[in-house]
């Protein structure tokens, strides 16, 4: 039996060997919404430019940006006596090997694991840690809840977009979103990282929740670290342009964002 999860959809699946194999096994593919980067795209980015890293910035990790990853985690082995485990993340488009830092020591992989560090393997060469928080169930689906690239100047913007995606992916609102706003704290155990909380009222209607989340994402976006056009791109499937313009005008009136001089700027950026 295949251990791969039916996660993701590849428009070029006809040319994808792993996708063809899945089709042969009659395992259906599931379309993941929005602009997803699936595993084959991550691998492709790494292979096309494996030397893209420079200093602390690993350019090909950009394949993770805006990612929704729904994959199956397969346990491979423990690494000596360390709290690290080696595993494989697979979806319908391919697989990558990962090294995961377990939340606590145990003889076996717990039923649920909070993983905080993932080390990507590219053709046997290990690269700098990618930090993430994953909720995973052994041999089951795994959902990316939190993502950042260590020592990357654009880390905060990825957090914000990730929050948007996480919210839109879920059927119900979440009371509290949280992400780090001080990337130095990742590498300084004594630093107190600032956190921004996006408070979502579960009693609100879904549309109102989405509007409120969009408002807060825009508000906590100093110097437009996330291009507004990208933020709106992810909300357009949930909101119409009239609703978007209404909330933008509210933010401008409240001096929470700068006026851009055009109601349609988001479509023209």
Swiss-Prot record:
UniProt region (Disordered), positions on chain: 1-25
Any one GO MF annotation of this record: DNA binding
Composition bias type Polar residues, residue spans: 1-22
InterPro entries (UniProt xref): NA-bd_OB-fold
One cellular component (GO) term of this entry: DNA replication factor A complex
Superkingdom of this protein's organism: Eukaryota
Gene3D superfamilies cross-referenced by the UniProt entry: Nucleic acid-binding proteins
Annotated compartments: Nucleus; Chromosome, Telomere
Keywords of the record: Chromosome, DNA-binding, Nucleus, Telomere
DNA-binding segment(s): 69-149
Family the entry assigns: Belongs to the replication factor A protein 2 family.
Role, per record: Component of the heterotrimeric replication protein A (RPA) and holoenzyme telomerase ribonucleoprotein complexes. As part of the RPA complex, binds and stabilizes single-stranded DNA (ssDNA) intermediates, that form during DNA replication or upon DNA stress. It prevents their reannealing and in parallel, recruits and activates different proteins and complexes involved in DNA metabolism. Thereby, it plays an essential role both in DNA replication and the cellular response to DNA damage.
Subunit structure: Component of the replication protein A complex (RPA), a heterotrimeric complex composed of RPA1, RPA2/TEB2 and RPA3/TEB3. Component of the telomerase holoenzyme complex, composed of the catalytic core (the catalytic subunit TERT, the telomerase RNA template component TER and TAP65/p65), which is associated with two heterotrimeric subcomplexes: (i) the replication protein A (RPA)-related subcomplex, composed of TEB1, RPA2/TEB2 and RPA3/TEB3 and (ii) the CST-like subcomplex, composed of TAP75/p75, TAP45/p45 and TAP19/p19.
Name of the protein this chain belongs to: Replication protein A 32 kDa subunit
Species per Swiss-Prot/TrEMBL record: Tetrahymena thermophila (strain SB210)
């Amino acid at each position: 039996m295949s251990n791969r999860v039916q996660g993701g959809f590849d428009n070029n699946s006809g040319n994808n060997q792993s996708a063809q194999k899945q089709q042969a096994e009659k395992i259906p593919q599931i379309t993941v919404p929005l602009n997803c980067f699936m595993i084959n795209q991550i691998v492709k980015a790494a292979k096309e430019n494996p030397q893209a890293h420079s200093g602390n910035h690993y350019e090909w990790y950009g394949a993770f940006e805006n990612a929704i990853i729904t994959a199956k985690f397969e346990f491979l082995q423990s690494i000596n006596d360390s709290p690290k485990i080696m595993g494989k993340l697979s979806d319908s488009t391919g697989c990558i090997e990962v090294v995961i830092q377990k939340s606590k020591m145990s003889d076996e992989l717990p039923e649920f694991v909070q993983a905080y560090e993932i080390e990507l393997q590219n053709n046997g060469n290990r690269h700098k840690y990618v930090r993430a928080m994953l909720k995973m169930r052994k041999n089951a689906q795994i959902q990316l809840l939190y993502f950042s690239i260590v020592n990357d100047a654009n880390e905060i913007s990825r957090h914000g977009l990730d929050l948007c995606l996480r919210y839109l992916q879920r059927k119900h609102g979440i009371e509290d979103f949280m992400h780090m706003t001080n990337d130095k704290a990742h590498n300084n155990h004594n630093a107190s990282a600032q956190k921004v909380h996006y408070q979502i009222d579960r009693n609100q209607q879904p549309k109102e929740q989405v509007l409120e989340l969009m408002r807060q994402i825009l508000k906590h976006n100093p110097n437009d670290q996330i291009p507004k056009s990208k933020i709106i791109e992810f909300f357009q499937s949930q909101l119409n342009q009239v609703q978007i313009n209404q909330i933008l005008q509210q933010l401008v009136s409240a001096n929470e964002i700068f006026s851009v001089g055009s109601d349609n700027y988001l479509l023209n950026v």
